[in-house]
Structures are given as C-alpha cells and as structure tokens.
C-alpha cells in the first residue's frame, strides 16, 4: 500500500512543483493558448523559483514551499493587475484561415475527434516517457550512481537544509560554513528541493523532477514545437493538434537528450535544459499576440516568455547556445520567404522585449556563468577524430553509442527514417524550411565535431558543452519529433489524395469526399504501427539503460554499506566536527541523507579551497607534515570515511592546480593505507567502507 501511494504521490507532487507557478503566471497574463501552456509551464515555474531563490538572500527569508508560493502569488498578482487595468485596450489579432490546398479540412465532429485523438496521443507519449523512468529507477528513492549527480544531490540537500538558494550561495565548498562559493546553475536543484520537501526527501525530489523534465516536459515541448510549425503552415487546428500528438509519441521514446546524458555521466542540468529547449523554441517562433497591455497581449506574453527563458537558462547556461543558434538559423531561413518576413516583422518587438526581461531575470546567473566561461571552453574534446561516413550515418540512423553502445550496434532507425522523410516532405512542399534548417545545422555541427574535434566550427560551437560529443550530438534529437510529425501527417494525406485521383471508379469517391477524416484515420493507423514497432521497444530499451545507473547499476558509488556508515557517523559526530572524505565514493550521501558535514563535495577538490585537494593528496602524511596536521585540526575533523572499492572516474584535466595528473581517479592517495596512523582507529566497518575515528588530542601532541 505504501509503495502504491508513493508510486503516484511523488510524481504528482513533482508535477505540482513544475506546473503550478507556470500555469498561474500564464493564466494571470491572459495566456490561454494551449501551445504556450504546454511549452512554457515548466520553464516559467523554474523562472519563478529563481525569483524565490533571490528572495531567500534577504535575511529572515528561507527558500521553501511558503516562499515559493508567496513569490508565485505576488508575481501572478502583478501580471494580473496589469492585464486587468489595461483590459479593453487591446486590438484583436487577425484570424488566419486554414490553407485547405495544403491539408484537407477537418470540421464539425471530425475536428473534435481529431483534437480528442491528439490529446490521447500526447497523454500516451507522457505515459511512455514516465514509464521508462520509473522502470529504470525501480523506485523514486533509488540512489543515483553517476559522477555528476554527486554535486547535484549536495545542492538539493543544502537548499533543503539551509533554505539558502540565492545564486551567490550555491555551490558552497564547505557545507558547514557555506563558504567559499563556486557558482553552479541552480535551476534544477530548486524544484528538486521543493519536490523533496513535499515527497520523500532530496533523492526522491531529484529523481522525480529529472524524470518529469526529461520525460513529459520534453514530450510536451516537442508537441508544442510541431504544433508551432503547423500553425505557421496554416494547417488548421485539427491537423496542428494531430501533428503535436504525433511528435509527442516520437519524443517519448528517444534516447537523447535525457536518457543518454543522465546515463553517460549523470549530466542532469544539461539534460533538463535541453529537454525544455523545444518548448522554448515553440514559444519563440509563435511569439506575438494582441496589441496593447491587456489580457493575452503581446507585451504580457513577452514578460512570460522572458521569465521562461530565464528559467531554462538558470538550469544550464549552455542552453543559450542551444536555443539561440537554433532560432537564429530558423529566422534566417524563414526570412528568405515572404510569409516568414511578414511574421518576423510582427514578432521582433516582442522578442526584443522578452530578451530584456530574460536578461534582467537571469542577471546573477549571467554573471556567474561568465565567470566559468573560460574554464568551460578550455576542455579538450572527449573523442578522437572519426571518418566522415561513420559520423554522418550514425547520426542519421540515431545510433545509441556512448557508454551503453560503444560499438554502435543499436539505433533508433525508425525515428531517424521518419525524420529524413520529413526533410524530403519539406523539400517537396517548399515550406517549413526553418525546422529542416535547424536539424541540418546541428547535424553539420555534430558531424564536423566528430570528424575534426580539435578544430573547425563544430569544436567552436561545442565549447559551451565542454566539447563533449554526447552533449553536442543530443541537439539532433530535439528536431526529430517535429520532422517525424511532418512526415507521418503529409505522407498519410498524400496517400489518400493519390487514392482519390481516379475520376471514374466510384470506389475512390470516398477519398475525395472525406479526404480530411480518412487522412486522419490513416494517420492513426500509421501511428499505431509506430507505437507497436518502435515506441514501445524504445521505451523498454531506455528503461534498461536507465536501470544500469539506478535499479541495477553496473557500478556502485553508494550502497547499503555507505548508508550504514553514514548513519553511524550521524549518530556519533559532534556539532562542529567534519567528516574527512573523498567525494568519489558514497560519503557525500552522509550529508545528503543525514546532514553530516563533509570536507569534500567535489570529487577532485576545489581551487577555491586548496585544503580540500591538499587533504585528498596528503591526508595520510599528517604524522610527519605539520602543515597537513594544522589543516586537519583547524577543520575540526572528527571522522574519516574510506571506501576501498570506489568506482573509477575520468580525471581528465579537471583537477585544480593539476594536483592529480593520472587519467582516472578512484581512491584518493591521501586516504590510502590509513591503518596504524597515530590517533586514528577503526570505529565502523561494513563491506568495503571503513569509518575511522580521529583523536585530535593525539595530533595536537605530535612534535612539529
């Protein structure tokens, strides 16, 4: 019974966290457009939490559910007040009639049926996307095992524990004092902390929010992007809705961005930001609205859009390149068409206003990310040069690749083929050039990076993404759902129109008289085949991949031994004492779960606090090194945590001041062979985990 309740309750709690602020702000602004509600609800919610995080920097205010609700209500009230006092001062927008020469009309009950069917498709996509995450996690409170999630979990726990969520408070290198601070984007930890407060704690909150953003939010954003493209085609509301439903089904089973980025390193913020990018793009290319400042006006929509952009930027600043480059390519190509120029002329003031709002709302994140820009751009590519043919074919076929499929055996060929057909449809119709151009742009970037990772435009564009192939490669998948939707819709309609070409045989008359309904029915058949042949198998494989980092991990960073050790330390450590540790094992979860202050929250230490990596290198030298001994005493270290079977991680160029030069890292040199050192005794041991008690009086008595 408890399991059944948590199975539903925790995702619902996370859903409320991601949906309520965004919906309230949009509704207060008079936004009733379902496309925008699907595209921007989660980004706007995170943007609102960014304001709440800033407010937590005011003495006496603590980040949590009450403050988040207060900021939501205040912001909604301001927006609603502007809309209310300016009501009646808006000019109606012109109504565009559907282009029936492009798509057959859907009217009356057939239109209603199409919209209901589209809703079913979207809900089915959401269900598939959530199922793969729940299946791979096993339960919502399963410990993450990947490397990057170490910092993410510390951030979520720190926010929950202290209520400090301002950008200048995150990431604290010393969780006991909160200082010094190394900037880390907080857009994902903020909703995860709130979700954990109303569900099962930091781990549950983090897992639920990750699953929701990389699953349903990506599905809804992809549906919104497809709907935005079809709206620009004047396809009519029925076909626009069906295109969104088709895109949702395709998005639900894609391996990238969410599944692979969280599997290959636990790159949660980048995965989340990229998963919200289609929704932001959908809003950007449909920006506009009524003239004036009344409900639903273009200027209030600009405010909403700006808050949403700021929210996604706070999740991972690299999304500026993801969205910015994509939408610039879209506008350049669309500006080459008469209709594109007409739309852009009406949009640019709104987009400019939204940009100003986004810049103001994310000013602190902009400053923080600027401080990290040089570090991000200096990383070396994580792949060697490869042949052009392999680079092109693997990305057209959507090969899995990465740690799960290093030899490129598996692929999501059905989705890749549909996307290629979609590109051919664009060429045949000579419309929707912008979306094909975005896909082609990122395909060219990815292929160039794969062939020339050290030079060229691919390497330059890849700088905000740490020159990581999986991060850059994931951009292609952002446009697969919309291209697939174009393919299935227009191919289904084309088949029916061809069937209705013969003039004499009465058997083909139905294809002419009921072209719209029959085309929609044929689309349903095509999508049913895709679900059975591709979507469900993709979901199963994605769940298997996720399980290798959660439910059935291939390697273990934290297990029951770590949990027992953390509980022991929590019961015995004194106030003000710290636990000496290496963050590469499960020791940081002593802080996440039991609030035990640990010395290291970053696996290789921090350049802002040199003692962190100096102890990782030389802690065991305290009997003979007065400097190390002084550091140990000044930090008031009471216990030492060692896991002799810590997992292997890539060290690369990541160690501060190059204190560690080997390509991989497991157990810190300073924590090896501790048995028998003066003042150090085994206090607890379980499996490969040992906790030593440190008698500081013995250290103080050692000769200098």
Locate each region found by the language model:
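Membrane-interface helix-loop junctions at the exits of transmembrane helices
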Residues: 48-51, 127-134, 162-165, 243-261, ...
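Membrane-helix boundary/interfacial segments in multi-pass membrane proteins
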Residues: 59-66, 138-145, 199, 256-272, ...
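Membrane-embedded, hydrophobic transmembrane alpha-helices
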Residues: 1-110
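Periplasmic/ER-lumenal interhelical loops and adjacent helix-loop junctions
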Residues: 169, 182-184, 346-428
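Extracytoplasmic
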Residues: 13-19, 526, 530-704
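Membrane-interface helix-loop-helix junctions at transmembrane boundaries of multi-pass membrane enzymes
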Residues: 234-241, 295-296, 339-349, 421-455, ...
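Active-site lumenal/periplasmic loops and adjacent helix-entry segments of GT-C-fold
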Residues: 122-271, 275, 292, 544-556
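Short hydrophobic alpha-helices at membrane interfaces in multi-pass membrane enzymes
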Residues: 287-310
């Amino acid at each position: 019974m408890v399991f059944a309740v948590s199975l539903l309750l925790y995702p619902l709690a996370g859903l409320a966290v991601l949906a309520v602020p965004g919906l309230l702000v949009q509704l207060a602004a008079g936004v009733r457009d379902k496309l925008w509600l699907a595209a921007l609800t989660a980004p706007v919610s995170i943007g609102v939490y960014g304001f709440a995080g800033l407010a937590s920097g005011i003495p006496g205010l603590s980040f949590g559910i009450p403050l988040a609700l207060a900021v939501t209500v205040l912001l909604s009230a301001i927006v609603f007040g502007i809309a209310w006092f300016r009501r009646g001062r808006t000019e109606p927008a012109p109504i565009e009639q559907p282009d029936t020469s492009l798509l057959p009309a859907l009217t009356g009950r057939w239109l209603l049926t199409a919209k209901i069917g589209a809703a079913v498709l979207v809900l089915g996509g959401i269900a598939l996307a959530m199922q793969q995450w729940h299946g791979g996690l096993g339960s919502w409170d399963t410990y993450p095992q990947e490397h990057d999630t170490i910092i993410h979990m510390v951030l979520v726990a720190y926010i929950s524990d202290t209520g400090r969520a301002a950008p200048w408070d995150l990431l604290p290198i010393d969780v006991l004092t909160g200082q010094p601070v190394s900037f880390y984007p907080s857009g994902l930890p903020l909703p995860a902390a709130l979700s954990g407060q109303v569900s099962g704690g930091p781990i549950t909150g983090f897992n639920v929010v990750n699953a929701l953003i990389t699953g349903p939010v990506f599905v809804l954003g992809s549906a919104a992007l497809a709907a935005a493209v079809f709206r620009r085609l004047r396809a009519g509301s029925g076909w626009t809705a069906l295109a969104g439903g088709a895109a949702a089904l395709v998005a639900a089973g894609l391996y990238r961005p969410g599944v692979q980025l969280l599997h290959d390193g636990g790159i949660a913020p980048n995965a989340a930001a990229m998963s919200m990018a289609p929704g932001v793009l959908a809003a950007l290319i449909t920006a506009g609205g009524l003239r004036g400042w009344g409900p639903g006006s273009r200027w209030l929509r600009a405010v909403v859009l700006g808050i949403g952009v700021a929210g996604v930027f706070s999740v991972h600043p690299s999304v500026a390149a993801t969205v910015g480059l994509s939408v610039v390519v879209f506008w350049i190509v669309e500006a080459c068409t008469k209709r594109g120029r007409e739309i852009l002329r009406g949009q640019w003031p709104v987009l400019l206003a939204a940009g100003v709002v986004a810049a103001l709302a994310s000013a602190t994140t902009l400053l923080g990310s600027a401080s990290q820009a040089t570090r991000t751009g200096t990383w070396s590519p994580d792949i060697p040069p490869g042949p052009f043919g392999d680079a092109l074919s693997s990305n057209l076929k959507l090969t899995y690749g990465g740690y799960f499929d290093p030899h490129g055996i598996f692929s999501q060929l059905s989705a890749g083929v549909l996307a290629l057909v979609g590109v051919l449809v664009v060429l045949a119709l000579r419309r929707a050039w912008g979306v094909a151009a975005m896909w082609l742009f990122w395909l060219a970037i990815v292929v160039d990076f794969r062939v020339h990772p050290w030079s060229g435009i691919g390497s330059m564009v890849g700088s905000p993404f740490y020159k990581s192939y999986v991060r850059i490669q994931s951009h292609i998948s952002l446009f697969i759902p919309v291209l697939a939707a174009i393919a299935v819709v227009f191919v289904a309609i084309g088949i029916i129109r061809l069937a209705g070409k013969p003039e004499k045989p009465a058997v083909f008359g139905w294809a002419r008289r009921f072209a719209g309904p029959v085309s929609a029915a044929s689309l349903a058949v095509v999508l049913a085949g895709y679900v059975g042949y591709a979507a469900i198998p993709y979901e199963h494989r994605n769940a298997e991949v996720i399980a290798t980092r959660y439910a059935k991990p291939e390697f273990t960073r934290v297990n029951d031994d770590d949990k027992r050790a953390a509980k022991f330390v929590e019961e015995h450590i004194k106030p003000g004492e710290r636990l000496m540790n290496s963050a590469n094992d499960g020791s940081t979860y002593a802080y996440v779960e039991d609030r035990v202050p640990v010395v290291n929250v970053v696996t290789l230490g921090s350049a802002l606090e040199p003692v962190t990596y100096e102890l990782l290198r030389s802690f065991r030298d305290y009997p003979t090194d007065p400097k190390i001994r002084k550091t140990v005493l000044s930090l008031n270290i009471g216990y030492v945590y060692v896991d002799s079977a810590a997992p292997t991680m890539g060290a690369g160029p990541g160690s501060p001041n190059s204190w560690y030069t080997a390509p991989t890292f497991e157990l810190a040199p300073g924590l090896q062979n501790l048995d028998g050192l003066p003042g150090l005794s085994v206090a607890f041991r379980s499996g490969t985990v040992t906790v030593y008690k440190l008698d500081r009086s013995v250290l103080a008595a050692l000769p200098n």
